Regions:
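Short, charged recognition helix plus adjacent turn
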Residues: 1-9, 13, 17, 21, ...
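Residue-level detection of the helix-turn-helix DNA-binding "recognition helix"
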Residues: 35-36
Length: 70
């Protein structure tokens, strides 16, 4: 089974705690996202911090053609 985009972001940051620290949220929030999904307001910060695209994190909000910013 392939890792989810959030799992890839956690791996890129090192740990869930490290990702939480990068985003200024609690580790519990990151854990919560595993079952509930990444909040819209966190997709771009996660992309900037880890390189996991906003499209992968929230394809409902960021269609593939919007992935590359100018």
């Amino acid at each position: 089974m392939q890792p989810t985009p959030l799992e890839r972001a956690i791996r890129a940051a090192g740990t869930g705690r490290a990702l939480a620290d990068l985003l200024g949220v609690t580790p519990m929030a990151v854990s919560y996202w595993k079952s509930r999904g990444v909040p819209a307001r966190q997709a771009i910060p996660i992309e900037k911090a880890t390189g996991v695209s906003r499209h992968d994190l929230r394809p409902d909000l960021y269609p593939a053609e919007d992935v590359q910013a100018p």
